[in-house]
Swiss-Prot record:
Record-annotated disulphide pairs: C288-C306, C310-C330, C389-C411, C415-C438
Protein name: Cysteine-rich secretory protein LCCL domain-containing 2
Main localization category: secreted
Oxidoreductase keyword on record: no
Pfam families: CAP, LCCL
Record keywords: Disulfide bond, Glycoprotein, Repeat, Secreted, Signal
Lineage, opening ranks: Eukaryota, Metazoa, Chordata, Craniata, Vertebrata
Cleaved signal peptide residues: 1-22
Gene Ontology biological-process entries: extracellular matrix organization; face morphogenesis
Assembly with partners or alone: Binds to heparin, dermatan sulfate and chondroitin sulfate.
Gene3D superfamilies: CAP, LCCL-like domain
Tissue expression per record: Present in kidney renal tubules (at protein level).
The species this protein was found in: Mus musculus (Mouse)
Gene Ontology MF terms: glycosaminoglycan binding; heparin binding
Amino acid sequence: MSCLLNNMVLMGLALLVCGVQAFFLPNTTSLEKLLSKYQHAEPHSRVRRAIPMSDRQEILMLHNKLRGQVYPPASNMEHMTWDEELERSAAAWAHRCLWEHGPAGLLRSIGQNLAVHWGRYRSPGFHVQSWYDEVKDYTYPYPHECTPRCRERCSGPMCTHYTQMVWATTNKIGCAVHTCRNMNVWGDTWENAVYLVCNYSPKGNWIGEAPYKHGRPCSECPSSYGGGCLNNLCHRAEKPHKHKPEVDMMNEVESPPAPEETHVWVQPRVIKTKKTPVINFMTQVVHCDTKMKDSCKGSTCNRYQCPAGCLSNKAKVFGSLFYESSSSICRAAIHYGVIDDRGGLVDVTRNGMVPFFVKSQKNGMESLSKYKPSSSFTVSKVTETAVDCHATVAQLCPFEKPATHCPRIQCPARCGEEPSYWAPVYGTNIYADTSSICKAAVHAGVIVDEVGGYADVMPVDKKKSYVGSLRNGVQSESLNTPQNGNAFRIFAVRQ
Protein backbone atom coordinates (compact mmCIF):
# COMPACT_ATOMS: atom_id res chain seq x y z
CA MET A 1 0.00 0.00 0.00
CA SER A 2 1.30 3.44 -0.85
CA CYS A 3 0.25 6.43 1.19
CA LEU A 4 -0.55 9.82 -0.27
CA LEU A 5 0.36 12.71 2.00
CA ASN A 6 -1.43 15.98 1.48
CA ASN A 7 -0.56 19.52 2.50
CA MET A 8 -1.38 20.89 5.90
CA VAL A 9 -4.68 22.71 6.28
CA LEU A 10 -6.01 25.35 8.63
CA MET A 11 -7.26 24.31 12.09
CA GLY A 12 -5.20 21.18 12.18
CA LEU A 13 -7.20 18.96 9.86
CA ALA A 14 -5.59 15.92 8.32
CA LEU A 15 -6.59 12.71 6.59
CA LEU A 16 -4.44 9.84 5.41
CA VAL A 17 -5.34 8.47 2.00
CA CYS A 18 -4.24 4.96 1.30
CA GLY A 19 -4.25 3.43 -2.14
CA VAL A 20 -4.43 -0.29 -2.71
CA GLN A 21 -3.97 -2.61 -5.64
CA ALA A 22 -7.07 -4.62 -4.77
CA PHE A 23 -10.34 -3.54 -3.16
CA PHE A 24 -10.11 -5.03 0.34
CA LEU A 25 -12.95 -4.86 2.82
CA PRO A 26 -12.75 -7.17 5.83
CA ASN A 27 -15.83 -8.95 7.05
CA THR A 28 -17.26 -8.18 10.47
CA THR A 29 -15.26 -10.88 12.21
CA SER A 30 -11.96 -9.63 10.80
CA LEU A 31 -12.71 -6.06 11.79
CA GLU A 32 -13.61 -7.11 15.32
CA LYS A 33 -10.32 -8.97 15.62
CA LEU A 34 -8.40 -5.89 14.53
CA LEU A 35 -10.31 -3.67 16.92
CA SER A 36 -9.80 -6.11 19.78
CA LYS A 37 -6.08 -5.31 19.73
CA TYR A 38 -6.91 -1.95 21.20
CA GLN A 39 -9.10 -3.28 24.02
CA HIS A 40 -8.53 -5.46 27.07
CA ALA A 41 -10.46 -8.66 27.54
CA GLU A 42 -11.44 -8.25 31.19
CA PRO A 43 -15.19 -7.65 31.47
CA HIS A 44 -17.36 -5.78 33.92
CA SER A 45 -15.06 -2.86 34.67
CA ARG A 46 -16.51 0.48 33.75
CA VAL A 47 -15.03 3.80 32.73
CA ARG A 48 -16.79 6.77 31.27
CA ARG A 49 -17.21 7.10 27.55
CA ALA A 50 -14.42 8.54 25.43
CA ILE A 51 -16.77 11.29 24.29
CA PRO A 52 -19.74 13.02 25.94
CA MET A 53 -23.13 11.84 24.73
CA SER A 54 -24.02 15.34 23.53
CA ASP A 55 -20.89 15.46 21.32
CA ARG A 56 -21.59 11.98 20.01
CA GLN A 57 -25.12 12.97 19.00
CA GLU A 58 -23.86 16.18 17.40
CA ILE A 59 -21.25 14.35 15.31
CA LEU A 60 -23.62 11.63 14.14
CA MET A 61 -26.51 13.98 13.37
CA LEU A 62 -24.29 16.34 11.39
CA HIS A 63 -22.70 13.51 9.39
CA ASN A 64 -26.10 12.15 8.35
CA LYS A 65 -27.48 15.61 7.61
CA LEU A 66 -24.53 16.50 5.37
CA ARG A 67 -24.47 13.08 3.67
CA GLY A 68 -28.13 13.53 2.76
CA GLN A 69 -27.56 16.86 1.00
CA VAL A 70 -24.57 16.11 -1.27
CA TYR A 71 -24.58 17.54 -4.77
CA PRO A 72 -24.93 16.00 -7.24
CA PRO A 73 -27.41 13.84 -5.28
CA ALA A 74 -26.41 10.30 -4.32
CA SER A 75 -28.42 7.23 -5.25
CA ASN A 76 -26.71 4.86 -2.78
CA MET A 77 -25.76 6.97 0.26
CA GLU A 78 -26.19 4.90 3.43
CA HIS A 79 -27.36 6.14 6.81
CA MET A 80 -24.57 6.21 9.43
CA THR A 81 -24.83 4.69 12.90
CA TRP A 82 -22.56 5.02 15.91
CA ASP A 83 -20.21 2.11 16.58
CA GLU A 84 -18.78 1.69 20.08
CA GLU A 85 -15.90 -0.48 18.87
CA LEU A 86 -14.81 2.32 16.56
CA GLU A 87 -15.25 4.78 19.43
CA ARG A 88 -12.93 2.72 21.65
CA SER A 89 -10.31 2.39 18.93
CA ALA A 90 -10.49 6.16 18.36
CA ALA A 91 -10.05 6.73 22.10
CA ALA A 92 -7.00 4.46 22.22
CA TRP A 93 -5.35 6.48 19.45
CA ALA A 94 -6.41 9.88 20.80
CA HIS A 95 -4.81 9.08 24.17
CA ARG A 96 -1.45 8.66 22.47
CA CYS A 97 -1.53 12.35 21.47
CA LEU A 98 0.26 11.74 18.17
CA TRP A 99 -0.56 14.15 15.34
CA GLU A 100 -0.59 11.43 12.70
CA HIS A 101 -2.87 8.66 11.54
CA GLY A 102 -2.78 5.30 13.21
CA PRO A 103 -2.32 2.69 14.33
CA ALA A 104 -0.99 1.35 11.05
CA GLY A 105 -2.51 -2.09 11.47
CA LEU A 106 -5.99 -0.67 11.84
CA LEU A 107 -5.78 1.79 8.94
CA ARG A 108 -5.96 -1.08 6.45
CA SER A 109 -9.62 -1.57 7.31
CA ILE A 110 -10.93 1.75 8.66
CA GLY A 111 -11.00 5.37 7.52
CA GLN A 112 -9.90 8.13 9.85
CA ASN A 113 -10.35 11.90 10.14
CA LEU A 114 -8.35 13.96 12.64
CA ALA A 115 -8.68 17.47 14.01
CA VAL A 116 -6.98 19.41 16.78
CA HIS A 117 -7.32 22.84 18.32
CA TRP A 118 -6.29 24.81 21.37
CA GLY A 119 -7.50 28.02 22.96
CA ARG A 120 -11.20 28.75 23.15
CA TYR A 121 -13.74 25.96 22.99
CA ARG A 122 -14.84 24.56 19.64
CA SER A 123 -17.48 21.88 19.44
CA PRO A 124 -16.78 18.68 17.49
CA GLY A 125 -19.45 19.86 15.06
CA PHE A 126 -17.20 22.78 14.13
CA HIS A 127 -14.52 20.36 12.92
CA VAL A 128 -17.04 18.08 11.18
CA GLN A 129 -18.36 21.08 9.25
CA SER A 130 -14.79 22.08 8.37
CA TRP A 131 -14.16 18.62 6.96
CA TYR A 132 -17.31 18.83 4.87
CA ASP A 133 -16.50 22.34 3.65
CA GLU A 134 -13.67 20.92 1.56
CA VAL A 135 -16.47 20.24 -0.93
CA LYS A 136 -15.83 23.71 -2.36
CA ASP A 137 -12.53 22.40 -3.79
CA TYR A 138 -13.86 19.02 -4.94
CA THR A 139 -15.30 18.20 -8.36
CA TYR A 140 -17.46 15.09 -8.47
CA PRO A 141 -16.32 12.58 -11.16
CA TYR A 142 -19.30 11.55 -13.27
CA PRO A 143 -19.35 7.99 -14.70
CA HIS A 144 -18.29 9.07 -18.21
CA GLU A 145 -15.16 10.64 -16.69
CA CYS A 146 -14.04 7.36 -15.09
CA THR A 147 -12.32 5.20 -17.74
CA PRO A 148 -12.41 3.04 -15.68
CA ARG A 149 -10.58 4.79 -12.84
CA CYS A 150 -11.77 8.21 -11.72
CA ARG A 151 -9.18 10.95 -11.77
CA GLU A 152 -8.68 12.86 -8.52
CA ARG A 153 -10.17 16.33 -8.90
CA CYS A 154 -9.32 18.41 -5.85
CA SER A 155 -8.36 22.03 -6.48
CA GLY A 156 -7.53 22.84 -2.85
CA PRO A 157 -5.03 21.64 -0.25
CA MET A 158 -7.15 18.63 0.65
CA CYS A 159 -10.54 17.04 -0.11
CA THR A 160 -10.18 13.66 1.58
CA HIS A 161 -11.93 14.66 4.82
CA TYR A 162 -14.99 15.46 2.72
CA THR A 163 -14.82 12.33 0.57
CA GLN A 164 -14.50 10.05 3.62
CA MET A 165 -17.50 11.76 5.21
CA VAL A 166 -19.66 11.20 2.11
CA TRP A 167 -18.35 7.77 1.09
CA ALA A 168 -21.63 6.00 0.37
CA THR A 169 -20.76 2.57 1.78
CA THR A 170 -19.26 3.94 5.00
CA ASN A 171 -22.11 3.41 7.45
CA LYS A 172 -20.43 3.28 10.87
CA ILE A 173 -18.59 5.94 12.82
CA GLY A 174 -17.00 6.19 16.25
CA CYS A 175 -15.11 9.19 17.62
CA ALA A 176 -13.23 10.24 20.72
CA VAL A 177 -12.04 13.53 22.19
CA HIS A 178 -8.96 13.78 24.40
CA THR A 179 -7.15 16.76 25.88
CA CYS A 180 -3.38 16.36 25.40
CA ARG A 181 -1.25 18.22 27.94
CA ASN A 182 1.49 18.73 25.36
CA MET A 183 1.11 17.75 21.71
CA ASN A 184 3.55 18.19 18.86
CA VAL A 185 1.61 19.63 15.92
CA TRP A 186 3.69 20.31 12.83
CA GLY A 187 6.80 20.98 14.89
CA ASP A 188 5.14 23.22 17.50
CA THR A 189 4.16 22.15 21.00
CA TRP A 190 0.51 22.87 21.76
CA GLU A 191 -0.50 22.92 25.42
CA ASN A 192 -3.91 21.51 26.37
CA ALA A 193 -4.57 20.55 22.76
CA VAL A 194 -8.07 19.14 22.23
CA TYR A 195 -7.67 16.16 19.89
CA LEU A 196 -10.62 14.74 17.91
CA VAL A 197 -10.28 11.31 16.26
CA CYS A 198 -13.09 9.85 14.13
CA ASN A 199 -12.84 6.30 12.78
CA TYR A 200 -15.04 5.07 9.93
CA SER A 201 -16.06 1.62 8.67
CA PRO A 202 -16.10 0.32 6.04
CA LYS A 203 -13.30 2.65 5.01
CA GLY A 204 -13.61 5.01 2.06
CA ASN A 205 -11.24 7.01 -0.13
CA TRP A 206 -10.39 4.14 -2.44
CA ILE A 207 -8.16 5.55 -5.17
CA GLY A 208 -9.79 5.70 -8.59
CA GLU A 209 -13.38 5.51 -7.30
CA ALA A 210 -16.12 8.09 -6.84
CA PRO A 211 -17.36 8.51 -3.26
CA TYR A 212 -20.94 7.67 -4.24
CA LYS A 213 -23.17 6.95 -7.23
CA HIS A 214 -25.01 9.87 -8.78
CA GLY A 215 -28.77 9.52 -9.15
CA ARG A 216 -32.16 9.86 -7.51
CA PRO A 217 -31.77 9.52 -3.73
CA CYS A 218 -32.21 5.95 -2.47
CA SER A 219 -32.72 4.55 -5.99
CA GLU A 220 -29.70 2.20 -5.71
CA CYS A 221 -29.68 1.22 -2.05
CA PRO A 222 -28.33 -2.22 -1.08
CA SER A 223 -31.10 -4.81 -0.78
CA SER A 224 -30.37 -5.21 2.94
CA TYR A 225 -32.12 -1.88 3.55
CA GLY A 226 -35.42 -3.31 2.31
CA GLY A 227 -36.28 -0.20 0.31
CA GLY A 228 -36.07 2.08 3.35
CA CYS A 229 -35.18 5.74 2.77
CA LEU A 230 -34.82 8.57 5.31
CA ASN A 231 -33.69 12.10 4.43
CA ASN A 232 -32.13 10.94 1.14
CA LEU A 233 -30.22 8.13 2.91
CA CYS A 234 -30.63 4.36 2.61
CA HIS A 235 -32.16 3.55 5.98
CA ARG A 236 -33.03 0.29 7.66
CA ALA A 237 -36.20 0.51 9.73
CA GLU A 238 -35.44 -0.42 13.32
CA LYS A 239 -37.56 -2.90 15.21
CA PRO A 240 -39.44 -1.34 18.09
CA HIS A 241 -37.87 -2.02 21.47
CA LYS A 242 -38.38 -0.99 25.03
CA HIS A 243 -36.16 1.84 26.21
CA LYS A 244 -34.41 1.48 29.52
CA PRO A 245 -34.64 4.44 31.87
CA GLU A 246 -31.86 6.97 31.45
CA VAL A 247 -29.44 6.67 34.38
CA ASP A 248 -25.83 7.64 34.92
CA MET A 249 -24.67 4.12 34.02
CA MET A 250 -26.15 4.54 30.52
CA ASN A 251 -23.19 6.81 29.72
CA GLU A 252 -20.68 4.11 30.59
CA VAL A 253 -19.31 1.19 28.62
CA GLU A 254 -17.63 -2.09 29.45
CA SER A 255 -13.88 -1.61 29.50
CA PRO A 256 -10.81 -2.67 31.50
CA PRO A 257 -9.81 -0.91 34.70
CA ALA A 258 -8.02 2.33 34.00
CA PRO A 259 -7.38 5.60 35.81
CA GLU A 260 -10.47 7.74 35.45
CA GLU A 261 -9.78 10.77 33.31
CA THR A 262 -11.58 14.05 33.38
CA HIS A 263 -11.60 15.85 30.04
CA VAL A 264 -10.07 19.28 30.51
CA TRP A 265 -11.62 21.60 27.95
CA VAL A 266 -9.96 24.93 27.42
CA GLN A 267 -13.33 26.55 27.98
CA PRO A 268 -15.34 24.23 30.26
CA ARG A 269 -18.82 23.44 29.09
CA VAL A 270 -21.66 23.32 31.55
CA ILE A 271 -24.41 20.91 30.54
CA LYS A 272 -27.68 22.27 31.83
CA THR A 273 -31.09 20.72 31.96
CA LYS A 274 -32.88 21.41 28.72
CA LYS A 275 -35.64 23.95 29.01
CA THR A 276 -38.44 24.86 26.68
CA PRO A 277 -36.90 27.43 24.32
CA VAL A 278 -38.04 31.00 24.86
CA ILE A 279 -39.32 32.65 21.71
CA ASN A 280 -38.36 36.32 21.49
CA PHE A 281 -40.33 38.82 19.46
CA MET A 282 -39.09 42.21 18.35
CA THR A 283 -42.61 43.46 17.59
CA GLN A 284 -44.55 44.60 20.65
CA VAL A 285 -48.34 44.38 20.55
CA VAL A 286 -49.75 47.63 21.98
CA HIS A 287 -53.09 49.36 22.55
CA CYS A 288 -54.39 52.59 21.06
CA ASP A 289 -53.53 54.54 24.21
CA THR A 290 -50.06 53.03 24.77
CA LYS A 291 -47.54 55.84 25.22
CA MET A 292 -44.03 55.70 23.87
CA LYS A 293 -42.48 56.49 27.27
CA ASP A 294 -44.41 53.62 28.89
CA SER A 295 -43.65 50.95 26.28
CA CYS A 296 -40.01 51.64 25.44
CA LYS A 297 -38.13 50.09 28.35
CA GLY A 298 -35.85 47.67 26.55
CA SER A 299 -33.69 47.32 23.47
CA THR A 300 -36.50 45.99 21.29
CA CYS A 301 -38.66 49.10 21.41
CA ASN A 302 -38.63 49.96 17.74
CA ARG A 303 -41.45 47.96 16.13
CA TYR A 304 -45.07 47.88 17.24
CA GLN A 305 -48.30 46.18 16.17
CA CYS A 306 -51.23 48.59 16.45
CA PRO A 307 -54.86 47.45 16.65
CA ALA A 308 -57.71 48.72 14.51
CA GLY A 309 -59.97 51.59 15.60
CA CYS A 310 -57.37 53.98 17.07
CA LEU A 311 -58.59 56.98 15.03
CA SER A 312 -61.57 57.52 17.35
CA ASN A 313 -59.54 56.92 20.52
CA LYS A 314 -59.00 59.92 22.80
CA ALA A 315 -55.32 59.29 23.56
CA LYS A 316 -53.23 62.45 23.07
CA VAL A 317 -50.56 63.09 20.44
CA PHE A 318 -48.07 65.97 20.78
CA GLY A 319 -46.17 67.26 17.76
CA SER A 320 -46.06 66.75 14.00
CA LEU A 321 -42.84 65.30 12.55
CA PHE A 322 -41.25 64.72 15.95
CA TYR A 323 -43.68 63.39 18.54
CA GLU A 324 -43.31 63.87 22.29
CA SER A 325 -42.66 60.66 24.28
CA SER A 326 -45.99 60.84 26.16
CA SER A 327 -47.86 60.57 22.83
CA SER A 328 -49.86 57.51 21.79
CA ILE A 329 -47.68 55.44 19.45
CA CYS A 330 -50.54 54.19 17.29
CA ARG A 331 -52.33 57.53 17.01
CA ALA A 332 -49.03 59.26 16.13
CA ALA A 333 -48.62 56.67 13.35
CA ILE A 334 -52.12 57.47 12.03
CA HIS A 335 -51.42 61.21 12.26
CA TYR A 336 -48.23 60.85 10.25
CA GLY A 337 -49.88 58.52 7.69
CA VAL A 338 -47.85 55.37 8.42
CA ILE A 339 -51.01 53.34 9.15
CA ASP A 340 -54.74 54.00 8.93
CA ASP A 341 -57.64 53.10 11.21
CA ARG A 342 -57.23 49.42 10.29
CA GLY A 343 -54.04 49.27 12.36
CA GLY A 344 -50.75 47.67 11.33
CA LEU A 345 -47.01 47.68 11.91
CA VAL A 346 -45.08 50.80 12.92
CA ASP A 347 -41.34 51.37 13.24
CA VAL A 348 -40.25 53.88 15.88
CA THR A 349 -36.95 55.77 16.18
CA ARG A 350 -36.03 57.56 19.40
CA ASN A 351 -34.51 60.98 18.69
CA GLY A 352 -33.54 62.54 22.02
CA MET A 353 -34.59 65.93 23.39
CA VAL A 354 -36.60 68.45 21.33
CA PRO A 355 -37.25 72.02 22.69
CA PHE A 356 -40.95 72.13 21.74
CA PHE A 357 -43.69 70.34 19.76
CA VAL A 358 -46.15 72.00 17.32
CA LYS A 359 -49.70 70.82 16.68
CA SER A 360 -51.11 70.04 13.21
CA GLN A 361 -54.14 68.51 11.49
CA LYS A 362 -53.33 65.39 9.44
CA ASN A 363 -55.15 62.30 8.22
CA GLY A 364 -58.38 62.98 10.08
CA MET A 365 -56.91 63.82 13.49
CA GLU A 366 -55.34 66.79 15.26
CA SER A 367 -52.20 66.68 17.36
CA LEU A 368 -51.45 69.05 20.26
CA SER A 369 -48.63 71.49 20.99
CA LYS A 370 -46.26 71.32 23.94
CA TYR A 371 -43.76 74.12 24.56
CA LYS A 372 -41.48 72.26 26.88
CA PRO A 373 -38.26 70.31 26.16
CA SER A 374 -38.86 66.58 26.13
CA SER A 375 -37.62 63.36 24.54
CA SER A 376 -39.04 62.62 21.09
CA PHE A 377 -39.62 59.89 18.54
CA THR A 378 -40.47 59.52 14.86
CA VAL A 379 -42.54 56.86 13.11
CA SER A 380 -42.04 55.07 9.79
CA LYS A 381 -43.74 52.43 7.68
CA VAL A 382 -42.74 48.75 7.89
CA THR A 383 -42.21 47.03 4.56
CA GLU A 384 -41.83 43.34 3.72
CA THR A 385 -39.05 41.92 1.55
CA ALA A 386 -38.63 38.38 0.22
CA VAL A 387 -34.95 37.38 0.14
CA ASP A 388 -32.91 34.35 -0.86
CA CYS A 389 -30.77 32.20 1.41
CA HIS A 390 -27.65 34.28 0.75
CA ALA A 391 -28.98 37.76 1.66
CA THR A 392 -27.19 39.55 4.50
CA VAL A 393 -27.95 42.50 6.76
CA ALA A 394 -24.74 44.13 5.51
CA GLN A 395 -26.31 44.22 2.03
CA LEU A 396 -29.89 44.99 3.01
CA CYS A 397 -29.87 47.37 5.98
CA PRO A 398 -26.49 47.80 7.72
CA PHE A 399 -26.42 49.36 11.18
CA GLU A 400 -26.16 53.15 11.41
CA LYS A 401 -26.50 55.24 14.55
CA PRO A 402 -28.85 56.02 16.17
CA ALA A 403 -30.82 53.12 14.67
CA THR A 404 -31.57 51.32 11.42
CA HIS A 405 -34.88 49.71 10.51
CA CYS A 406 -34.92 46.61 8.34
CA PRO A 407 -37.95 45.40 6.42
CA ARG A 408 -39.73 42.32 7.67
CA ILE A 409 -37.89 39.42 6.03
CA GLN A 410 -39.58 36.54 4.21
CA CYS A 411 -37.26 33.53 3.98
CA PRO A 412 -37.59 30.56 1.63
CA ALA A 413 -37.48 26.96 2.83
CA ARG A 414 -34.32 24.92 3.42
CA CYS A 415 -31.80 27.72 3.88
CA GLY A 416 -30.33 25.70 6.72
CA GLU A 417 -29.04 23.22 4.15
CA GLU A 418 -27.01 25.80 2.24
CA PRO A 419 -23.23 25.19 2.46
CA SER A 420 -21.35 27.54 4.78
CA TYR A 421 -19.16 28.94 2.01
CA TRP A 422 -22.29 30.26 0.24
CA ALA A 423 -24.40 31.08 3.29
CA PRO A 424 -22.18 31.48 6.37
CA VAL A 425 -23.48 32.14 9.87
CA TYR A 426 -21.19 33.78 12.43
CA GLY A 427 -22.14 33.86 16.10
CA THR A 428 -24.92 32.82 18.46
CA ASN A 429 -27.89 35.03 19.47
CA ILE A 430 -26.07 38.04 18.03
CA TYR A 431 -24.73 37.45 14.52
CA ALA A 432 -22.18 39.22 12.33
CA ASP A 433 -24.02 41.16 9.60
CA THR A 434 -22.17 39.20 6.91
CA SER A 435 -24.15 36.12 7.99
CA SER A 436 -26.99 34.69 5.93
CA ILE A 437 -30.15 36.19 7.43
CA CYS A 438 -32.34 33.18 6.73
CA LYS A 439 -29.81 30.54 7.79
CA ALA A 440 -29.26 32.52 11.00
CA ALA A 441 -33.04 32.49 11.49
CA VAL A 442 -32.99 28.68 11.32
CA HIS A 443 -30.02 28.56 13.71
CA ALA A 444 -31.84 30.82 16.18
CA GLY A 445 -35.06 28.79 15.96
CA VAL A 446 -36.97 31.74 14.55
CA ILE A 447 -38.21 29.83 11.50
CA VAL A 448 -38.56 26.14 10.64
CA ASP A 449 -36.11 25.13 7.94
CA GLU A 450 -38.54 22.88 6.06
CA VAL A 451 -41.09 25.67 5.48
CA GLY A 452 -39.26 29.01 5.83
CA GLY A 453 -41.24 32.01 7.01
CA TYR A 454 -41.02 35.57 8.32
CA ALA A 455 -38.42 37.10 10.64
CA ASP A 456 -37.74 40.51 12.14
CA VAL A 457 -34.15 41.79 12.08
CA MET A 458 -32.56 44.41 14.33
CA PRO A 459 -29.16 45.77 13.20
CA VAL A 460 -26.85 46.51 16.14
CA ASP A 461 -23.30 47.71 16.65
CA LYS A 462 -20.47 45.26 16.03
CA LYS A 463 -19.12 42.86 18.67
CA LYS A 464 -15.50 42.10 19.44
CA SER A 465 -16.04 38.41 18.75
CA TYR A 466 -18.71 35.90 17.76
CA VAL A 467 -18.95 32.38 19.20
CA GLY A 468 -20.17 29.54 16.99
CA SER A 469 -22.57 26.78 18.05
CA LEU A 470 -24.71 23.97 16.67
CA ARG A 471 -28.41 24.76 16.91
CA ASN A 472 -31.42 23.40 15.06
CA GLY A 473 -29.18 21.49 12.65
CA VAL A 474 -27.11 24.55 11.67
CA GLN A 475 -23.47 24.94 12.70
CA SER A 476 -22.54 28.60 13.08
CA GLU A 477 -18.92 29.72 13.01
CA SER A 478 -16.79 31.71 15.42
CA LEU A 479 -15.21 34.99 14.40
CA ASN A 480 -12.57 36.91 16.34
CA THR A 481 -11.76 40.62 16.03
CA PRO A 482 -13.68 41.23 12.78
CA GLN A 483 -12.16 44.10 10.84
CA ASN A 484 -15.32 45.36 9.17
CA GLY A 485 -19.06 45.16 9.51
CA ASN A 486 -21.56 45.26 12.35
CA ALA A 487 -24.05 42.80 13.79
CA PHE A 488 -27.75 41.98 14.10
CA ARG A 489 -30.30 40.21 16.24
CA ILE A 490 -33.13 38.17 14.76
CA PHE A 491 -36.62 37.62 16.11
CA ALA A 492 -39.67 35.48 15.49
CA VAL A 493 -42.83 36.98 14.01
CA ARG A 494 -46.20 36.42 15.67
CA GLN A 495 -48.46 34.53 13.33
